[in-house]
Amino acid sequence: MRPLLLSIVAIALCACHAAPEEQSVKPGINTNFLDPNLEVDKYVERFETESREVFAKRTGIARAIGLEPGMAIADVGAGTGLFVDFFARDVTAAGRVYAVELSPKFVENLRARAARRNQPMVEVVQCTERDVSLPAASVDAVFTCDTYHHFEYPAATLASIRRALRPGGALVVVDFERIPGQTRDWLMKHVRCGKEQVIREVLAAGFTLEEEVPLGFEENYFLRFRR
């Protein structure tokens, strides 16, 4: 058999045995955030209020990440920018904060916000449903807060996060507990999986679990993984 034909056969065989593309774990979970008429101010009122646990504990959460001047961090699912100011302060002008967002309206707001606050270290990134859209080995840490349960394609998204992290980099996941009989009904319906499943998925993506940081949460948890 000629070399060219052998190559074609080999390619065809590989294609036949290629892994199927990951299916959505919860179709439509991000539809509201993709609305071109999304009203950002309403989400600011909803996300940035003392009645939201992660807002009330925002200072402790930011401190627990352990950022230092000159480091680079990606806030995946940056939303209204709740943690961006903390990260910009901690990494200083010598560092970099990537505010990563799927929602076009949040992206627009984050860019205007960084300009108003004179934060040249903040770079806003429009991501996709499968990829955080960051350069390889570009960050020391990736942070997600009440965002992991919005990963519609978690395996693909985690693979892109792992590519973006430098060796030894940290992935911090802050998200809702999902405990039958304890978690509020709306969270049981909204959040697709509990902490144990999140850990399984992140470990399967090639990370190691370093610790769960106790911050006095009632509805959330803080997990630190390493690349």
Placement of each model-derived feature along the sequence:
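C-terminal motif of bacterial Sec signal peptides marking the signal peptidase cleavage site
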Residues: L13-A15
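Class I SAM-dependent transferase core
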Residues: H17-A74
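Hydrophobic beta-strand segment of the Class I
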Residues: I73, V142-F143
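Class I SAM-dependent methyltransferase SAM/SAH-binding core
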Residues: A74, A78-D131
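A short acidic, Gly/Pro-enriched loop at the edge of an enzyme's catalytic core
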Residues: V132-A141
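A short glycine-rich, Lys/Arg-flanked "PGG" loop and its adjoining helix->strand segment in the class I
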Residues: A155-A170
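Conserved class I S-adenosyl-L-methionine
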Residues: V172-Q197
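Core SAM-dependent methyltransferase catalytic element
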Residues: E211-R227
